[in-house]
Amino acid sequence: MLNILSIILILFVSSYDKSYGFEKTMNKIDLETYNWTKRLLVINLKSQDKEKLSYVDNWLFANKCIIEDRNINIVFFEDFKNKKYKKPPFLIDFGFWLVGYDGEVKSFSLEEKFVNEIFYLIDQMPIRQQEMLMYKKKC
């Protein structure tokens, strides 16, 4: 009888933990909500990687207008975690992902200098080519 009660208690506790974890992720935003509205630069850095973070911060500050002009949303993950966003399926390493309007990964790099290439990569995309014809540059 004691064994049966122990098993029931273990099953109850384990299902409670799983549902609690599920509730925590339910409130997070899925990056797919940005499909067809934003391009994404998804960055996943190690918490102790201060040099890369500083490099990216300086790049963001220097390129604010260009980032806005190309309709890019920057999403940071630290050690695969983000309080606001769900972890996307492609986030299996540390690095930098450029995600297009269609939600597909267009390019990936482990190196922070990749951020310097994304404007060129975006400007080669067909939708961006149309945007450049239709809209006046802001920067």
Language-model features, listed with the residues they occupy:
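Non-catalytic interaction/Regulatory regions outside core domains
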Residues: 2-139
